[in-house]
Structure formats: structure tokens, C-alpha cells
């Protein structure tokens, strides 16, 4: 089932509301039942049962409640608002996730927030955007619960608009996607996770261990391994010095330390002494390291350390020490320079380049070993990925300005002739939904 053009919802509650159901044109992948989705385009009290409708039909909502404007749209005025993006997670036992979701829905119903908030029996994982007053109101409300009172919250600028298209509040089996799921992992047992290091401790440890690279270039002789537990394309725009590019494009497929030497010779954990080697793990916000460290712990790795709060927390507290480039983020911004997290590193991070209020910059990389165009291998001038213009590909890739023009915004020559080709985007822009371009072509088509 899919609804369009407004944001949609699919829940398993039965409280009746004044919602009118109307037909709409198909606009993409189907909805999932029992998935709560809120936005500023639908009723703020989503409690209508959808499971009675056939999944072969297309529907959209037109809410007639008093909180709506014309055509059922919410009355949120974003003009002049100071938007931020908020990220946090917590592994904690939640006995009744559905009841917990109801509490969150009740509080969020009147807030202008969009993003992803996942809950289950193991805790919560949230990334969302909104006006600062609304975004922080949710944080303060959550901290009123003893289970979340000391929650570590990451914040960054959101370009004065939402960084997500809608808000999903969902009871999800896995707080992060990993092959085989994570419900069986001992995430609620802190000793089974890596030991968290404060940013200052992490910085000091990296500095103290730098000499090991020169003294022992092979893994077998090192006293530590710096492990980037992200995707390769994230490393391409920024990473800690000394961290090798992860040969993975999706965290769910991460398998460091799980294969023998014959199967994965490029595994950075091959031939390391599991008893004596310090494994220093980092990711964007920390949750992927917490998850994967339990996997490594079960495989016999003893000395596991993680960067508390991830790279975003480190940049805020320590600036760019030992870090090079930008930080990839999983929202419409795609990439942020260190200055977005710490104003004091502007000069050091980007020199004379101009940083706008969103923290964007045409920063030229200082490390020429990364930030390469995926097509011609030249140095890119902007540390930000783009999506392939071919809708059916949509690959994230780094590209220089020349290749953008030559390949019409596509990631390869094969995509240029694709039937659903979107226009070339220049600068920091994101593609709209396909129907925007399709309808535009239909309107501009000559009459016959």
C-alpha cells in the first residue's frame, strides 16, 4: 500500500478520527503496516486502522480535524525558524515498546519534528530535525524518564529547514540493520560492549600509539588497530588518520574479524592477537560500534574500545585533531565540516574558505589520499556525495564538476540512457520525488 503525495501513516490502533480516505497516484515503494509515520501533512493524532484496506489500492489522507489547514495540511510555519538535527540512542530494556510508542506519539503530536525514531525491547535510536524549540522539547521530555536521564545528545545545524521528509516512529526489530538482526546480541550487558573512551582519552590514545605504525607496519606486530566501523563511502569524505577504508558499503554486511585469512585477506583484524591487541573502534554516533563490539567480544577479542558519542561528539569536544575531512551524515545534508560541530575549528579546518550558516564549505581536502572522483579519480573540491541522476540506480557517489557535466549527473555511462533520468543538479541540492520531474515533462510535452 502506498499513499501520495502527502506523507503517510500505517498503524495498528483503532481509535476513530475524522480522516477522509481518498485515492492517490502510486508514488513508490509500499507502506508497511504497523509503522507509525507523522509529518506536517497529516493528522497529528494518527490512530486509524489501515489493515482493513487491500494492499493493491492507492490511498492518501485528507484530515478534517481542527488542527489542520486547507486540504488537511498541518499549520506549521517554518519561515524564520532555527532548525537543528538531533541524534541519540540508548540501549535499555523497554518492556512494552508499543505502549512506549504511544507515549511518544502523544507528546510529539503537536511538535514540528521529522526523522526516524526506532524503539524496541533493546532501547531507542533517533535521528530527527525540527525547529530548535521543538527538537529540544522532545529531548527534555525524554530525559524526564530515569532510563534516559543521562542521554548523550548530538546536535548540528539543519540549513534552516528539515533534513528529513517525514517522521517515522516505529517499533523496529533492529535498532540498526545488521545481517541476522541484533535482537540476540547482549547489547543490554555493558561489559559485552566495547569500553567507551571520552574524546579526550581517544585523542590521547591515538597520539600515544601513532609511533606503532612506523615501528610495526604489519597487523601481527601492532599493539592496536584503528577500526572504522562505517561504510567505505563515509570514509571517502572524512576519517581519522591511520584508519583504513572499510571494504563495505552497508553496515549490515560488516564482517571484520569474522573470517579466516583465506576468505578475507583484506580484513584489518586478520592475524591480530585477540588477547593483546587494542581494537579502537569509531563510527558517526557510536551505535554501530556498540553493536559490532558485542559481535567481536563473542569472537574472543578482549581489548575493545569505542569513541564515546562517535565522531560527531569528538569534533565538538576536540576539534579536528587526528581527523581529516568532513563527516558523512545520513540525512539530506549528506556531509558536514568540523565547523558545524565546533565553531572554534573553522580556521583550522577550512582556512580561508567561507562556511555558511549550515556548516557547508567548498573545502579542498588537505589529504590527497581520499576524496577522489569515483569516475576519473581526480581530487574533488567538495566533500559531499550526490545521487545518480538515474532514478533506478540512485547510487551515492563522489564526483568532480567535469564528470557531472560529461555524464549528465550519472554515475556511469550505462545510466545516461536510462528511461527515468532526472535533470542534472549543480551545487548542494537533493533530488525531488520522481513524479515532480515526470509531471513536469508531461506538462512541457508538445501537443499532437
Curated annotation (Swiss-Prot):
Superkingdom: Eukaryota
Active site as annotated: 283 (cysteine persulfide intermediate)
SMART domains: RHOD
Transit peptide residues according to the UniProt entry: 1-23
PROSITE patterns: RHODANESE_3
Organism: Arabidopsis thaliana (Mouse-ear cress)
Gene3D superfamilies reported for this sequence: 3.30.70.100, Rhodanese-like domain
Swiss-Prot/TrEMBL keywords: Chloroplast, Plastid, Transit peptide
Lineage: Eukaryota, Viridiplantae, Streptophyta, Embryophyta, Tracheophyta
Domain Rhodanese residue range list: 220-323
SUPFAM superfamilies in alphabetical order: Rhodanese/Cell cycle control phosphatase
Main location: plastid
Subcellular location field: Plastid, Chloroplast
The protein's name in its UniProt record: Rhodanese-like domain-containing protein 8, chloroplastic
Any Pfam family the entry gives: UPF0176_N
GO annotations of cellular component type: chloroplast
